[in-house]
Swiss-Prot record:
One of its GO terms (molecular function) is structural constituent of ribosome. SUPFAM superfamilies: Ribosomal protein L31e. Belongs to the eukaryotic ribosomal protein eL31 family. GO terms for cellular component: ribonucleoprotein complex; ribosome. Coiled coil: none annotated. SMART domains: Ribosomal_L31e (SM01380). It holds the Pfam family Ribosomal_L31e. This is Large ribosomal subunit protein eL31. One of its GO terms (biological process) is translation.
Length: 92
């Protein structure tokens, strides 16, 4: 975790395998909710959680029924505004 001013940056690997236990028709929807829930659990002070559109596209890339099993994200938490922004981390 790196900290500068009121901003905290951290990289997390979020496992999404739990969404495969339920019905097939709404797995991507549940994956988005699971990401929000994960961020809320790890950043308890966050009043607002904003997901990047690229992350949303990545989760929906294989359709509604087959989201990825895990996703690597960078979370930027602004302590002053109590806002967490979630970005897709590009792994090269």
């Amino acid at each position: 975790m790196s900290e500068s001013g009121g901003m905290v940056k951290s990289v997390h690997v979020i496992p999404l395998k739990r969404v495969y236990f339920g019905r097939r028709m709404n797995r991507a929807d549940r994956a988005i909710r699971l990401v929000r829930k994960y961020v809320a659990r790890h950043f308890k002070d966050a009043e607002k959680i904003i997901l990047d559109p690229e992350l949303n596209k990545y989760i929906w890339s294989c359709g509604r029924e087959k989201p990825p099993r895990r996703v690597v994200v960078e979370i930027r938490f602004n302590k002053n505004e109590k806002e967490a922004r979630v970005f897709l981390k590009r792994v090269k």
